[in-house]
């Protein structure tokens, strides 16, 4: 029996097929590499590529379109150039650069693209953000009013930093800039502040040392390290701080507090200059491109203290700048000084004479941190800056004049004692209540008859003594944040008692 062909059935099937026929063709826009050198590829054919768009080379390496010219596109290569040759194809990815953000990154060392480089397995981040974000506007912000304690006496007393501030750390090489930053990170333990350390153009051994120090003090539990080493492509060094600040903004926008350190922006500017010159952009002063100010301003403006409606989170930035032979008037240092809310100036002369941290108190300033300083430390350090300035003046005078009158001699001696008080070994940040006690002791003359050489010993023995005999002093300063009459009386009594036992020893 022959099968009957039903014409209507066939026509129904054909109609269905026609209706469901999908003619969507996936069109990929590709280009060809014209030339490649020094981490930059010139590509022909990517007609509709956007500025800052990600592209992928045949070798699998990613790139970023930075120069859009009439006949070609200048693309910086984010990785190795070895597999990229003239004539190899490049395809658009139709997206801008994003990096992973969130708690999954804490405790990890990542590169500028947020990829792990610490051999601890993949990062399970659930969210990513654009690396280039617009800084928050005026209405979204609130003025800086909460302190960010660094644990360094000279800074917390004289150049206080507030949450949401941008404070520059500036000085020659080997003056302890990174140490100040690392101390600040170590001091955030238990303060609920997430720290991000961005290493730009550093030796890998230096970064490894920093990570080791942070692990040693248990600080990696709340720290992310972003590393673009000296051997990495200039494009990766250029992107590193933006990747770091994007990770920090995530915490700020979720009502949390973050601290970011850029170590250092001088090398960042050099990497950008290298990239710009290879892209044949016109050079300006010191051969930096014309937009090098904008390079740093758009980065540092992203640090802020948000208003209560947006969750009151904060992102504090401590950029580092390396000067050449103390020249603060060079192009990049002046740029960054004008962008930030103050600077901590470190001097090699002070460092070499044994005053460490080598902070020049006269040149260092915090433009907004005063509002964030706790009242107790304000009370004890009120006259400190002036005293130290007068001491420096007298010191210069005393070198030539042999006979000083009694009051000048006393002032000179007290100045020496205060300089000793402000000295501090690296990686040993002090709680704010301890700082208040020792500066109070110096300001009220309790160190006047202690030999300068014994000031460090006096300080080292004072804290355990108060902790054992007068624990309420530390407790009250910690909770009240002010030295009232009651606290002052106990403090005087404690210091007198301690002086008696110290003198006996």
UniProtKB/Swiss-Prot annotation:
Its main location: membrane. The record marks 364 as: Required for activity. ATP binds at residues 171-178. It catalyses: ATP + H2O + 4 H(+)(in) = ADP + phosphate + 5 H(+)(out). GO terms for molecular function: ADP binding; ATP binding; proton-transporting ATP synthase activity, rotational mechanism. The keyword Ion transport applies. GO terms for cellular component: plasma membrane; proton-transporting ATP synthase complex. Gene3D superfamilies: 2.40.30.20, ATP synthase alpha/beta chain, C-terminal domain, P-loop containing nucleotide triphosphate hydrolases. Keywords: ATP synthesis, ATP-binding, Cell inner membrane, Cell membrane, CF(1), Hydrogen ion transport, Ion transport, Membrane, Nucleotide-binding, Translocase, Transport. CDD domains: ATP-synt_F1_alpha_C, ATP-synt_F1_alpha_N, F1-ATPase_alpha_CD. Signal peptide: none annotated. It is a peripheral membrane protein. Its EC number is 7.1.2.2. InterPro entries: ATP_synth_asu-like_sf (IPR023366), ATP_synth_asu_C (IPR000793), ATP_synth_asu_C_sf (IPR038376), ATP_synth_F1_a_nt-bd_dom (IPR033732), ATP_synth_F1_asu (IPR005294), ATPase_a/bsu_AS (IPR020003), ATPase_F1/V1/A1_a/bsu_N (IPR004100), ATPase_F1/V1/A1_a/bsu_N_sf (IPR036121). Coiled coil: none annotated. It holds the Pfam family ATP-synt_ab_C. Belongs to the ATPase alpha/beta chains family. Produces ATP from ADP in the presence of a proton gradient across the membrane. The alpha chain is a regulatory subunit. HAMAP family: ATP_synth_alpha_bact. F-type ATPases have 2 components, CF(1) - the catalytic core - and CF(0) - the membrane proton channel. CF(1) has five subunits: alpha(3), beta(3), gamma(1), delta(1), epsilon(1). CF(0) has three main subunits: a(1), b(2) and c(9-12). The alpha and beta chains form an alternating ring which encloses part of the gamma chain. CF(1) is attached to CF(0) by a central stalk formed by the gamma and epsilon chains, while a peripheral stalk is formed by the delta and b chains. This is ATP synthase subunit alpha. It comes from Campylobacter concisus (strain 13826). The gene is atpA.
């Amino acid at each position: 029996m022959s099968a009957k062909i039903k014409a209507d059935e066939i026509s129904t099937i054909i109609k269905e097929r026609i209706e469901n026929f999908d003619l969507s063709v996936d069109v990929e826009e590709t280009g060809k590499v014209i030339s490649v050198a020094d981490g930059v590829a010139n590509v022909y054919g990517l007609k509709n590529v956007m500025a800052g768009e990600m592209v992928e080379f045949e070798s699998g390496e990613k790139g970023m379109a930075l120069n859009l010219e009439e006949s070609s596109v200048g693309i910086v290569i984010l990785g190795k150039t070895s597999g990229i040759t003239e004539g190899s194809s490049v395809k658009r990815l139709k997206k801008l650069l994003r990096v992973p953000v969130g708690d999954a990154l804490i405790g990890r060392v990542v590169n500028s693209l947020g990829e792990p480089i610490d051999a601890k397995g993949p990062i399970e981040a659930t969210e990513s953000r654009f690396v280039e974000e617009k800084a928050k506007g005026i209405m979204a912000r609130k003025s800086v009013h909460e302190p960010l304690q660094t644990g360094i006496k000279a800074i917390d007393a004289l150049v206080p930093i507030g949450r949401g501030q941008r404070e520059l750390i500036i000085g020659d090489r080997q003056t302890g800039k990174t140490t100040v930053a690392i101390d600040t990170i170590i001091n955030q333990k238990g303060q609920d502040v997430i720290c991000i350390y961005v290493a730009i153009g550093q030796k890998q051994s230096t970064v490894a040392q920093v990570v080791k120090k942070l692990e040693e003090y248990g600080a990696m539990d709340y720290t992310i390290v972003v590393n673009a080493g000296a051997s990495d492509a200039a494009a990766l060094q250029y992107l590193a701080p933006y990747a770091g600040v994007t990770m920090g903004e995530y915490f700020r926008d979720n009502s949390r507090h973050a601290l970011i350190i850029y170590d250092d922006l001088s090398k960042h500017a050099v990497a950008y200059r290298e990239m710009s010159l290879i892209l044949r952009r016109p050079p300006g002063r010191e051969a930096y491109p014309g937009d090098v100010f904008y390079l740093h301003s758009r980065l540092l403006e992203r640090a802020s203290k948000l208003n209560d409606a947006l969750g009151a989170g904060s992102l504090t930035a401590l950029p580092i700048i390396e000067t050449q032979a103390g020249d603060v008037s060079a192009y990049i240092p002046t740029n960054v000084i004008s962008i930030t809310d103050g600077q901590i100036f470190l001097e090699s002369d002070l460092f070499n004479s044994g005053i460490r941290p080598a902070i020049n108190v006269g040149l260092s300033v915090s433009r907004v941190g005063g509002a964030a300083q706790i009242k107790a430390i304000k009370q004890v350090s009120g006259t400190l800056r002036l005293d130290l300035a007068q001491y420096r003046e007298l010191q210069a005078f005393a070198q030539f004049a042999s006979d000083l009158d009694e009051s000048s001699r006393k002032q000179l001696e007290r100045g020496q004692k205060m300089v000793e008080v402000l000295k501090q070994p690296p990686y040993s940040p002090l709680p704010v209540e301890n700082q208040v006690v020792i500066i109070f002791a110096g300001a009220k003359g309790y160190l006047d008859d202690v030999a300068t050489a014994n000031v460090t010993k006096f300080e080292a023995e004072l804290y355990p003594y108060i902790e054992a005999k007068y624990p309420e002093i530390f407790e009250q300063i910690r909770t009240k944040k002010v030295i009232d009459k009651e606290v002052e009386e106990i403090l005087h009594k404690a210091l007198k008692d301690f002086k008696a036992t110290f003198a006996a020893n």
